[in-house]
Regions:
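N-terminal strand-loop element at the rim of the active site
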Residues: 6-13, 26, 30-91, 188
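Short hydrophobic beta-strand element within catalytic cores of glycosyltransferases
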Residues: 315-319
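A conserved mid-protein helix/loop that constitutes part of the nucleotide-sugar donor-binding site
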Residues: 17-22, 219-242, 256-262
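Membrane-proximal helix-turn-helix segments that form the acceptor-binding/catalytic region
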Residues: 103-109, 149-169, 187
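Conserved acidic donor-binding segment of nucleotide-sugar-dependent glycosyltransferases
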Residues: 330-343, 350-355
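Donor nucleotide-sugar binding/catalytic pocket of nucleotide-sugar-dependent glycosyltransferases
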Residues: 56, 139-142, 162-206
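Aromatic "clamp/platform" in nucleotide-sugar-dependent glycosyltransferases that forms part
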Residues: 279, 298
Length: 380
């Protein structure tokens, strides 16, 4: 039986972390022996749906610090590299982090057997172990690259993280961004493949039936995302106010922008219609009961929430942002895309709310079925 290992920094509530869990489940459903390892504990971790997925915790930072070299490199990075270069802490952490991970993997394989495929999800994960190299490993890039400023620093980082590695982009938009980065920062991956995120239709549709008394009984607009600048909630609030719709707007998620968004809702005189629902361990009932799901991000590597909302039978509207949203909203769904501006998004909301809730077609989700994604990872 083929054995797989998905590696993620933590199992906190977040899109990338949820995808890591979904991928581990997809490997299990495909008949593989599936393992999932995380580096940092959180109070309420995400869990795989299938009990057959074996979850492991490697306290990477603590073990790194137990080695004299690892502790010294962390101190050096904190006191020297980070102040000089900015965001360079991983250069120190990842040297011994990779050694610690390789040692853990060796012991893991002594107990469970040789791993056939290792999948690292997210740059934040493989930053912590960047010195680790293995031909069985695939490194998944979840988002597009940004090219403003500090090109020499970014070139150094890119050579540490991406050079001569087998990379996987979650969308063609991310892959195109990587190719531009290759030219600017002078690195060359061993390979680059596009594999979309899995959408576990069956488990989503089971989870969406869960009762939740906090969900409004009346129709509402919905956004599910961390409240951070990249998700563009300021644009969403302004467009929502401009649309003049009487339906409430529900924001599921939390983050650093919450206070400023509450203040903006008050400034726009829509505070009585905007519901800040906070983090929800199960967002799918909220998606199921929504009249319209609205995405307002500045960029999205894939936009997993779009096909999660579609899986729940809810119509979607998205701004046309850099990344992978066009790979979800294609064909008949292209009408769900609008220009990323306050006026266009407001007009899109108004148009989308006209008439009955539209039917969602099953074939729109075919590219993201877990069995296809699992097979794509082990085939390369």
């Amino acid at each position: 039986m083929m054995r797989t290992l998905v590696v993620v920094r933590s199992l906190k509530m977040g899109g990338m972390e949820r995808v890591a869990v979904n991928l581990a489940d997809a490997f299990h459903e495909a008949g593989y022996e599936s393992h999932l390892v995380h580096f940092r504990k959180v109070k309420r971790p995400l869990r795989p749906e299938h009990s057959g997925v074996k979850v492991h915790h490697l306290p990477l930072q603590q073990r790194n610090r137990l080695t004299l070299v690892g502790y010294g490199l962390e101190v050096l990075a904190r006191l020297l590299l980070n102040p000089l270069m900015g965001r360079a802490l991983f250069l120190g952490l990842g040297v011994m982090g990779g050694v610690v991970f390789r040692h853990w993997l060796k012991r893991f394989e002594q107990e469970h057997g040789r791993v056939d495929r290792i999948v690292f999800r997210g740059i934040g994960t493989f930053e912590l172990v960047w010195s680790f190299r293995d031909r069985r490993a695939r490194y998944v890039l979840e988002n597009i690259f940004h090219f403003n400023g500090a090109s020499r620093r970014k070139a150094l980082f890119a050579r540490c993280l991406y050079h001569r590695r087998d990379l996987v982009a979650v969308s063609q938009g991310v892959a195109d961004s990587l190719r531009k980065a290759q030219t600017l920062w002078k690195f060359r991956p061993r390979s680059l493949t596009v594999i979309p995120n899995p959408c576990p239709l069956r488990s989503i549709r089971e989870a969406m039936l869960e009762a939740n008394d906090a969900i409004p009984s009346e129709p509402y607009l919905l956004n599910v995302a961390r409240l951070v600048p990249a998700k563009g909630h300021d644009l969403l609030l302004r467009a929502y106010a401009r649309s003049g719709t009487s339906l409430p707007l529900v924001l599921v998620g939390d983050g650093q922008e919450r206070d400023s968004l509450v203040a903006l809702a008050n400034e726009l005189d829509i505070a009585d219609k905007v519901i800040f629902a906070g983090n929800q361990y199960n967002p799918y009932p909220w998606m199921r009961h929504a009249r319209l799901f609205v995405l307002s991000s500045r960029f999205e590597g894939m936009g997993i929430v779009l096909f999660e909302a579609l899986a729940c039978g809810t119509a979607v509207l998205s701004v046309d942002c850099p990344g992978g949203v066009r790979e979800i909203l294609k064909g008949e769904l292209e009408t769900s895309l609008v220009e990323r501006s306050e006026e266009a998004l407001a007009d899109g909301i108004t148009a989308a709310l006209e008439g009955p809730k539209p039917e969602v077609r099953e074939q729109w989700l075919d590219d993201f079925r877990p069995e296809r994604v699992a097979q794509a990872f082990v085939a390369r």
